[in-house]
């Protein structure tokens, strides 16, 4: 009997990625390990930045926000996915599905804007170092971070209620491991073309505008680095910027694939793999790419872990 015939109270069924794998138990253990690493590493980074006064700078303020987003990101999807697999129960309530969708859109929108704000921070630090403390004051950083969270919240509030209001009479089986908008829309038996146009326009704003800000910022950064006489200064600037560019490429590449490419280029399997990459792998990679190879962070970590030996 199909899962859709067992639906009670309008519940959905997350078919997930485990049905595609010959050894789901091993994949479940792997995902749980990744989840634990992502949670522990991001919490550690947040604590480091909070405790160590030398990390109280605009750059680490934004990294702190990024870690908070990544921590919430992976917590929205992975626990439910693992519980469903272990309990052999693929159901998710309509409320639970809508909650997943909202937080996913909110966090995704906030991260899009935050990565642009981080690029602007690097632009000011490298191109206008003498005015850095004024242009990137604590008040400015708070305004930028608050704006990122606000834009993400607006994105979630606009798209989620409309998506969940469509009638789902074809099936309640979601070909995904969480309630992502494109996967849920495929179940609707009504015309969703207008909503898809609206969502596409939102993606243009949330993806292409930040990408433009990042591209322009790095254009001027590269020009400034090229003019630097100090080899050490160039190396430090390139190291900082390369970390950010790596994070940007990983996140925006997967997001643009999922939300902006024509549906003819996409399949449920490819969509799940793309979403798996930037909802599960990215939160565990970001602390490594952006911070734990940074000398300031490693020094702060050693300082936090150091234990005073009692005198004998």
Swiss-Prot record:
Family: Belongs to the G-protein coupled receptor 1 family.
Name of the protein this chain belongs to: Olfactory receptor 2T10
Disulfide bridges in this chain: 97-189
Predominant localisation class: membrane
Record Pfam families: 7tm_4
The UniProt record lists the keyword Membrane: yes
Regions crossing the membrane: 26-49, 58-79, 101-120, 140-158, 196-219, 237-259, 273-292
Cytoplasmic side: 50-57, 121-139, 220-236, 293-312
Gene name in the database record: OR2T10
GO cellular component: plasma membrane
GO MF term set: G protein-coupled receptor activity; olfactory receptor activity
One biological process term in Gene Ontology: detection of chemical stimulus involved in sensory perception of smell
CDD domains recorded: 7tmA_OR2T-like (cd15421)
Species lineage: Eukaryota, Metazoa, Chordata, Craniata, Vertebrata
Alphabetically ordered keywords of this record: Cell membrane, Disulfide bond, G-protein coupled receptor, Glycoprotein, Membrane, Olfaction, Receptor, Sensory transduction, Transducer, Transmembrane, Transmembrane helix
Record topological domains on the Extracellular side: 1-25, 80-100, 159-195, 260-272
Sugar attachment sites: 5
